[in-house]
Amino acid sequence: MKGLFSISTAIMLSCASFQASSETINYYVIAKQATPFQIESPDKTHKGIVTDIVKAVFNGSKYDIDYHVYPFNRMISLLEQGGEANWITYGSPNWGGVQAENLSEMPIYNVKHSLVTSMNNTFDFNSMKDMDEKVIVLLHGFNYPQLVPYFDNGNVEELRVKDYKAAFRVIKKLPGETAFVEMQSRIKYNLSQQKLNTDAYRVQSFSSVIPDYPIYLAFDPKMDADIQAFINERLKTLKSTGKLDDIIHNYI
């Protein structure tokens, strides 16, 4: 009996030691609008470029990932209030705010923006002059300072939609009058996921208006210094071994 008690006690102490040694990383995911960077799933088998990178960073480590999925504006509001300790998501200096305060040492991806129109009554885009008296379709929650002057002076109209399906539907129904502006990677991914005929849409570079820029992992401004150093070292390893590029190519 004494031996059984000793074994049970040892097991309990071992479990307690494991729990004490593990630390939680609170990973914030944008619901619905961030594919292919973050793709949420009801069964919590989350994936996506950023999500897979985060998983790879902490794979085999003492850190556990706790997922938090919110609509974009709600997520930003929570993070501005402090969020959960040692939170992580993705961001860029170009975005400002909480997604730009504390970033990884190296970027994880370079963003390009594109303008999508219907091939039915399409038009060439060379400058914003080509958008005079037309409508630019944007997703809710995503703001582009470069476009604000054109919206403010009334030369271009702004139309917000809730998701990619709605955006593609608008430009299909109003060919020649509308264009959807979004990250090139998101456009290609969502056209494919929705099994739309890519020949029905024209994708043109929008880099002359929104210059290309890098995105990074974004951290809690108060993140534990050891955790942040660990992440940065793992990112360097993922890059040097080609794993980072492999993850990106799985989606794009």
Give residue ranges: language-model regions.
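Periplasmic-binding protein-like
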Residues: 31-33, 110-113, 196-232, 252
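N-terminal signal peptide c-region/cleavage motif recognized by signal peptidases
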Residues: 14-17
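Extended ligand-binding regions for polar small-molecule ligands
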Residues: 51-61, 214-249
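Short coil/turn segments
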Residues: 32-34, 42-44, 93-94, 118-122, ...
